[in-house]
Design a protein with these regions (language model features):
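Mature N-terminal, pre-catalytic/accessory segment of carbohydrate-active enzymes
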Residues: 1-27, 663-677, 686, 690, ...
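Glycoside hydrolase catalytic-domain context in secreted enzymes
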Residues: 1-628, 643-648, 652
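A short, ordered amphipathic alpha-helix with a cationic face
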Residues: 59-61, 246-251, 666-669, 678-679, ...
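Short, solvent-exposed helix-helix connector turns and helix-capping sites enriched
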Residues: 80, 126, 209, 418, ...
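Phosphate/pyrophosphate-recognition segments in soluble nucleotide-handling domains
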Residues: 295-302, 378-380, 658-685
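In a subset of proteins, long, contiguous C-terminal domains/tails are tracked
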Residues: 524, 540, 544-545, 577-579, ...
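Terminal connector regions
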Residues: 624-667
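Compact, charge-rich alpha-helical regulatory domains located at protein termini
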Residues: 668-740, 745-749
Length: 751
């Protein structure tokens, strides 16, 4: 008997139940008589929100000084898994220095709508990118002996009524869009805990959803860790235990502990189920205790430099007519309070108390830049007086270049509520338009956690998207504006022209009881590219101060089967005069003719550093899963036999290379034949196709010999026949004979 099982055997029922809930907001319970310690967990994901006095889970009370790293909206835009892992390592070391056993992150909910108030804490609209980046973060943190808690499992894609709303989603969209990031992280990086979400999923709370917490998470994905509730997400504690929820957070006053004891005593809860939950909780507790390393020292000054370096890799250059990088000899005007007081993080449970913050104005002053400053609009609201506008215009007119620092005030986007529009504050849009009348050289720097409408984008000289870049955002901004660093971030989400273009527009945020995911699998670029909806900036977009050329695409084979791994290689070259990094992106397109698939899906990416004139070969691998969609009839991933296209590019709307492969699968879709089964379904199945081909042979021969019939008309006729069900044979042959045919076909399928 191992240590934990032996401890459980010595526990009273009440002690077992007690371990299934927290001691307070941040600690697990201890049992002194058995030498079971308490361990601490704190909010992340982009820093430590450790509270030592009054505690809460919403970021209301003060926390210890820590380093605030860029939020996920920024780090995902780096497209750099190594950078994400290094950030995780640094966060893990900071946790060790503060005696914290678990960091509550990463957050991998898909950015379904740009209005979600918590989008700044999430990684991407694309599950592949989110999964890769989350896995790297988890590896980094846990390499330091600190646990993680990937969240919020699952479909917590809005803040409106997040604690009671039911996310109504198809099985296919669940599997293709909303679960893969969790699946990737669980299988590849084994987070110590998984945090279930507040909301319902198709009518059942996530904290009580056995299909989600046990059937998928544990049985399908093989997860061995602990499932913890979001703070206050438990509704029926006994049902939650039975579903697979191990640890309730925070402390519920002992009420739910007593419910567990009562359920066991009354025979409504098998004590073995409770024992399993206790074992998983103790695995977390003892891992935290045994892997605590007080020798690890975290230096905040060093970590601040890392935060600034990371943000430098994350910022996205959206527009540039050549004005950037700025010449240090030019007189530059900084306009907008964000230049002095940047918005560097979001509101809510992830809110960090930074030990320092460097603004762009600070950084310019430290380097002796020729910069004047006009505050003129507040970062806290949507207000600007005529006097403030006049001063801003004078300042802009007197400069060679005006840099306007715009973005969303914290009150516009935060945990707990959603935005109501994609617009910037009206005063900011007006200021930009007015400055353009007196100053042709206008650069806009954005601080926001989610896409915004940019009606003036075609008029300004450059736009630099900093997102919420952490406490070193000003240093990173200065480096990028003046060319000390080359922008290399790429958008991890699409910027539509307007909110109404977003695929979730008709359904977000629901009717108060439920929110229908009516766009199904067509989220983000999957919708825009397939529907051919013009967008302001595409997924993967981002400019550089240099240029890159692609060539020599090579596939390891022109054919592929279920078990094969295809190697895709190509060359990328820096054809400019500036050192830079290109984010190469690999997409897959299904050319088999299945209508309900996106025109392309991201299945690979890499960030490649290149000196001027340097060329490198990039290689990526593709498996059958990468070609597949989730087939509900099969209950599994399925790629039909046929042609697939490998696309290599700079963004989802900027494909540079492509090549086709032929894929052959041994999988067959399940089929049960009856009078409503179509000829097309039977012709597409290898076991029934010979019988139906023979049956339809006379009809095919007659059509082939018909005089005056064009090939196009013949194809239309073939399609009509394919769509006919077997019941149309009635009248052509006796009904009993049709029944006999159906029986014959089902026998063939059963073989």
């Amino acid at each position: 008997m191992d240590r934990i099982k032996e401890l459980i055997s010595k526990m009273t029922l009440e002690e077992k139940a007690s371990l299934c809930s927290g001691a307070d907001n941040w600690h697990t319970k201890e049992i002194k008589r058995l030498n079971i310690p308490s361990v601490m967990m704190v909010d992340g994901p982009h820093g430590l929100r450790k509270q030592e006095g009054e505690t809460d889970h919403l970021g209301l009370n003060e926390s210890v000084k820590a380093v605030c790293f860029p939020a996920a909206c920024a780090t995902a835009s780096s497209f750099d898994v190594d950078l994400m892992e290094r950030m995780g390592e640094t966060l893990g070391a900071e946790c060790q220095a503060e005696n914290v056993s678990m960091l509550l992150g990463p957050a991998v909910n898909i950015k379904r709508s740009p209005l979600c108030g918590r989008n700044f804490e999430y990684l991407s609209e694309d599950p592949y990118l989110a999964g890769r980046m989350a896995s790297a973060y988890i590896r980094g943190v846990q390499s330091q002996g600190v646990g993680t808690s990937i969240k919020h499992f699952a479909l917590n894609n809005q803040e409106t009524l997040r604690m009671t709303i039911s996310s109504e989603v198809s099985e296919r969209a669940l599997r293709e869009i909303y679960l893969p990031a969790f699946e990737e992280a669980v299988k590849e990086s084994a987070p110590r805990t998984v945090m279930c979400s507040y909301n319902k999923i198709n009518g059942e709370y996530a904290s009580e959803n056995r299909y989600l917490l046990t059937d998928i998470l544990r049985k399908e994905w093989g997860y061995k860790g602990c499932v913890v509730s979001d703070w206050g997400a438990v509704n029926n504690r006994v049902k939650g235990l039975q579903a697979g929820l191990d640890l309730e957070m925070p402390y519920s006053g002992g009420y739910n502990d007593r419910q567990i004891v009562k359920a066991v005593q009354e025979g409504r809860l098998d004590e073995a189920v409770l024992d399993e939950a206790v074992e998983r909780v103790l695995n977390v507790v003892f891992a935290g205790e045994e892997q605590h390393c007080p020798e690890i020292i975290s230096d905040k000054e060093t970590d601040h430099k890392k935060a600034a370096d990371i943000e430098t890799e994350c910022a996205v250059l959206l527009e540039n007519n050549g004005i950037l990088p700025l010449n240090t000899d030019r007189k530059v005007a900084y306009i907008g309070e964000f230049a002095e007081k940047p918005r560097y993080q979001g509101g809510g449970s992830s809110h960090i108390n930074p030990f320092m913050v460097v603004s762009a104005l600070d950084a310019a002053g430290e380097k002796g830049r020729s910069v004047t400053y006009a505050k003129e609009f507040s970062m806290e609201n949507d207000a600007m007086t005529e006097q403030e506008l006049e001063k801003a215009l004078r300042t802009a007119a007197e400069a060679d270049v005006s840099v306007i620092f715009a973005g969303l005030p914290e009150i516009f986007e935060s945990e707990g509520y959603d935005r109501t529009s994609m617009k910037l504050p009206q005063c900011q849009d007006r200021l930009i338009e007015e400055v353009l009348k007196v100053q042709p050289n206008v650069v806009v720097v954005l601080h926001n956690g989610s896409p915004v409408e940019l009606p003036w984008a075609d008029k300004v000289s450059a736009i630099l998207e900093m997102y919420l870049g952490g406490q070193g955002v000003g240093e990173a901004c200065d480096r990028l504006l003046y060319g000390e660093a080359n922008p290399s971030g790429r958008l991890a989400e699409t910027f539509p022209y307007r909110l109404e273009d977003n695929p979730s527009y008709l359904h977000f945020p629901g009717n108060g009881k439920r929110v229908l995911y009516g766009e199904d699998i067509f989220v983000g670029y999957r919708y825009y590219d397939t529907k051919k909806v013009p967008v302001r900036y595409a997924f993967g977009h981002g400019l550089s101060y240099t240029e890159f050329a692609y060539g020599d695409l090579n596939l390891s084979s022109a054919q592929m089967t279920d078990e094969d791994i295809l190697t895709v290689s190509f060359k990328v070259k820096n054809t400019g005069k500036t050192e830079g990094k290109e984010v190469v992106q690999l997409y897959v397109a299904d050319l088999c003719g299945i209508s309900e698939r996106p025109v392309k899906e991201l299945k690979g990416f890499a960030k490649v550093h290149l000196l001027p004139g340097e060329e490198k070969t990039v290689s990526m691998e593709i498996s059958a899963r990468d070609l597949s969609y989730y087939e509900e009839r099969l209950g599994d991933w399925y790629a039909p036999s046929g042609t697939y296209r490998i696309l290599i590019g700079h963004a989802s709307d900027d494909v540079r290379l492509h090549a086709d492969i032929i894929f052959e699968t041994q999988k067959e879709l399940p089929l049960c034949v009856d009078f409503t089964t179509t000829f097309g379904e039977l012709l597409d199945h290898t076991k029934t196709a010979p019988v139906i081909t023979e049956l339809l042979a006379p009809l095919a021969a007659a059509a082939a010999s018909a005089e005056g019939m064009s090939d196009e008309y013949k194809k239309l006729g073939e399609q009509v026949i394919r769509e006919m069900p077997l019941k149309f044979l009635l009248g052509q042959m006796p009904g009993e004979q049709v029944e006999q045919l159906i029986g014959q076909l089902n026998c063939l399928l059963a073989q």
